[in-house]
Amino acid sequence: MEQKYLLQPGKLTIETMRQVHRRHVPITLAPDSFERIHSAEQTVRDVITQGRTVYGINTGFGLLANTKIEVDELELLQRSIVLSHAAGIGTLMSASTVRLLMLLKINSLARGYSGIRLIVIEALIALYNHQVYPAIPEKGSVGASGDLAPLAHMSAVLLGEGEVIYQGNQISAEKGLMIAGLQPISLAPKEGLALLNGTQASTAFALQGLFYAENALTSSIAIGALSVDAALGSRVPFNERIHIVRGHQAQIDVATGFRTLLQESEIGKSHGGCEKVQDPYSLRCQPQVMGACLQQMRFAKQILVTEANGVSDNPIVFSESDDVLSGGNFHAETVAMAADMLAIALAEIGALSERRMALLIDSSLSGLPPFLVDNGGVNSGFMIAQVTSAALASENKSYAHPASIDSLPTSANQEDHVSMATFAGRRLRDIFDNVAGILAIEWLAASQGIDFRFPLKTSTQLQSVHALMRSKVTFYDKDRYFSPDIEQAKLLITRHSLSDLVQQDIQLL
């Protein structure tokens, strides 16, 4: 049996979240969290017995917050909010996204500030551990008041409503509960709202985008280094002293990655005394551009790790003082802005890759055969592959427009400013998909260029990068049906084959 990860509420690391995104990691809740969970639950009970009126416990929601609910309707109130808020539409979230979302929700609830019973948290853990994933539509949240619709679809399963995905099949929530050894739950006061309020969907999407960006940047450094050799680029721009005097650590780290990958290359040594003074920016300024992207990724990581471990419920239960305080921690503006930074970084990684690929097919810049193929004219080589790359890079410019500057009032103007964090995070997948295609095309081109430099060899590390490509796609000695080769190369990127190959040479996050 696979060992379970001991979840200490509020102490999730980026490494754990990365693992959960890539595969199923069973969890168990640290017993020392139980007391705080029980204390917050008792505070909610006290509110009811004392006859106090507290938002979310015995009132309506949103614009109806001033409507008091009688005691005999409190259970119905919590059930109703879950069912009415399960209004999402569109494609269902992937299993990896739902895993992250559930982990983050469990982590937040187990902090003991939501007033929810341990039995409800344990039910979520049971679903998660049995890989019974709620069927959650991707669209329907504006990132304030939390991710209501997505989390309602998750929570409805606990009531025996909605559907789940189990072993790739979509089945009823009732069957899913049986698989996890559960019965439908009747929610106690505040529990429905506690399940729904929170930024976990937005944060899961943004974290997923961070992992995509990490993969893209690692792959881009490896492919960019291969392009340097294919184009007979200079090593001087990667000299450590250049980057140290500027002082940006991320730029220094990216330059270190390039030096590591390019060291001891026969191709590099072959033109050390050439008269060419400077390379175009797409080769020469890679540490500066990719370093800037890495800076944004590191900043986004800090924000998202904090958010993943924070409490984004409302109201918040402070059992030590018997207070239940209403605020706005559900507003995901910080997540939206982090996702916007990642969108810009991802788009720039793709934009720079497209320029490097364009350089390689231009014989006047690279010294390689035009469009990287012999018998040009009869053969068009990589001519239209570069057009595809340009189309993808241009599309990403629209995707990278900041989502956080948009807002649209909801709930009859009670919720009059929202973050759009869910879309901000979700569109990162589409940007990455385009970037992976751009990088795949450059990798094909750079590998072709390396072959044209034979018998000179690139570095040992980059020979491995070249060999990985050639294990799937052969040399272009003449024109052939091109699209399948791009898809093969793209899979090597999206499935982490390339980033896993070079990750020990390139330390990023």
UniProtKB/Swiss-Prot annotation:
Keyword Ribonucleoprotein: no
One Pfam family of this chain: Lyase_aromatic
Catalytic activity: L-histidine = trans-urocanate + NH4(+)
Subcellular location: Cytoplasm
Gene3D superfamilies given in the database record: Fumarase/aspartase (Central domain) (1.20.200.10), Fumarase/aspartase (N-terminal domain) (1.10.275.10)
SUPFAM superfamilies from the UniProt entry: L-aspartase-like
Keyword Lyase belongs to the record: yes
GO biological process: L-histidine catabolic process to glutamate and formamide; L-histidine catabolic process to glutamate and formate
GO CC, any one term: cytoplasm
Main location as per UniProt: cytoplasm
Modified residues annotated as 2,3-didehydroalanine (Ser) in this record: S145
Modification after translation (UniProt): Contains an active site 4-methylidene-imidazol-5-one (MIO), which is formed autocatalytically by cyclization and dehydration of residues Ala-Ser-Gly.
CDD domains linked: PAL-HAL (cd00332)
Pathway: Amino-acid degradation; L-histidine degradation into L-glutamate; N-formimidoyl-L-glutamate from L-histidine: step 1/3
Domain of life: Bacteria
EC number(s) on file: 4.3.1.3
Keyword annotations: Cytoplasm, Histidine metabolism, Lyase
Annotated family: Belongs to the PAL/histidase family.
Name recorded for this polypeptide: Histidine ammonia-lyase
Source organism of the structure: Pseudoalteromonas atlantica (strain T6c / ATCC BAA-1087)
